[in-house]
A protein has these predicted regions:
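Non-catalytic terminal accessory segments
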Residues: 1-127
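Generic structural hydrophobic/aromatic packing signal, biased to beta-strands
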Residues: 25-26, 120, 136, 256, ...
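Short amphipathic alpha-helical coupling elements at transmembrane boundaries
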Residues: 67-74, 136, 151, 169-172
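Canonical alpha-helical transmembrane segment with a positive-inside/aromatic-interface signature
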Residues: 102-146, 150-152, 158-163
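Soluble catalytic domains of enzymes that build or remodel membrane lipids, polysaccharides, and related
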Residues: 141-363
Length: 363
């Protein structure tokens, strides 16, 4: 709860700072001057007050509350700095931002219209459910594993912003794929362990011949991993934290391994330990590893893991797939898509939901 208040205060101050810039630059252009600036600023601040009022209530506010409370708050955090930067560029370019400056008004209108269009595209992208089908080719694949179908779900981030309808759509897509094995690679919940209940409500009953396996993500750790762990096991999932289990398909024995997450403090049971994860796997054993954070892949690859499934990055929620670029690319060695090293492969799932702002483009 303290962390929630701290984040809320930071965002409130961020909002105020952005609106000081916006007001100072664009006040002469806006009809009504400072009064209009204050009204617009209040529309951005009001949702944060509503979020305070919502503390302690059910993790699932109504659709109407999500519409006026959660969405405007996060979109404001995304677009306010863009609007402020736009104003600075306008001044630097010498646009006449005086009260009678027609060019300034046109520029403001075009900028606001462009941002509104971008917001709609991003919102549509965040609501869109995409099923990606990939063929994974492995050298010297045991014959018994040929054609095995794995469904990976990652980064659902179930929380106040998540609709049950969306969760039902995801569950239906998983069933339709008729997988041999289901891998849930972390961040099942967003901020609160209690949100594992609506997650369980949507996915209880999912099954696959080889099993349903889940691992922790950083948000599961933040929310309280012990409670999330118990909730996942209660719905019949096999939870893997720094351990591997043997499975058999068509007479071929192989291993599914799951790591902890770097969000866990060193020495805690949920902190990643690759050595312990693979301790039970023989040197010749074919292994599929589940690791929420792709930063763990190099260590897994060094130990001969054939395939690693990760998530975490969301591809930065803004990406240009054809160029292999995402908003996360400048910050992460492995940010999106497929990677290969010394016979080991990594696939990074873009995530089944969004984090924070309901905005995704190209992801």
């Amino acid at each position: 709860m303290k962390a929630y208040w701290r984040i809320l205060v930071i965002l409130f101050l961020w909002t105020a700072a952005c609106w000081l810039v916006i007001g100072g630059l664009l006040r002469p252009v806006l009809p009504g001057g400072w009064l209009t600036v204050l009204v617009l600023a209040s529309l951005c601040v009001a949702p944060s007050l509503g979020m305070v009022r919502n503390l302690g209530r059910s993790a699932y506010p109504s659709a109407l509350r999500r519409l006026w409370l959660v969405r405007p708050f996060w979109y404001a955090q995304l677009f306010m700095p863009l609007l402020a930067v736009f104003g600075v560029i306008g001044v630097a370019a010498g646009l006449p931002f005086g009260a009678g400056g027609l060019a300034g008004r046109w520029a403001l209108g075009l900028g606001a219209g462009g941002l509104a269009g971008l917001a709609l595209l991003g919102y549509a992208g965040a609501r869109r459910l995409v099923v990606r089908r990939l063929d994974v080719r492995v050298d010297d694949l045991p014959a018994g594993l040929a054609g095995m179908r794995i469904v990976q779900i990652s980064d659902l981030h179930v929380g106040p912003h998540t609709s049950r309808r969306h969760l039902a759509r995801v569950a239906a897509a998983v069933r339709e794929a008729r997988p041999d094995l289901i891998a849930v690679t972390g961040d099942q919940v967003d901020d609160h362990a209690r949100d594992v209940e609506p997650f369980a409500e949507a996915f209880r009953g999912l099954s696959a011949p080889l099993g349903v396996f889940a691992i922790p993500g950083n948000h599961d750790v933040y929310a309280g991993w012990k409670a999330v762990h118990q909730g996942l096991e209660a719905m019949g999932m096999t939870v893997l934290v720094n351990r591997a289990v043997p499975l058999e398909r068509n007479g071929t024995r192989f291993w599914v391994a799951g790591t902890g997450d770097p969000a866990g403090r060193r020495g805690s049971p949920v902190a990643p330990d690759v050595e312990r994860t693979l301790a039970a796997v023989p040197p010749e054993g074919f292994t599929i590893a589940l690791a929420h954070n792709p930063a763990l892949w190099p260590a897994l690859a060094e130990r001969g893991v054939e395939l690693t499934l990760s998530g975490h990055t969301h591809y930065g929620q803004i990406a240009i797939p054809r160029l292999g670029w995402s908003l996360a690319s400048p910050f992460l060695e492995h940010a999106m898509g497929r990677h290969q090293r010394d016979g080991s492969q990594l696939y990074i799932n873009p995530g089944t939901n969004y984090w924070g702002i309901p905005f995704r483009l190209g992801t």
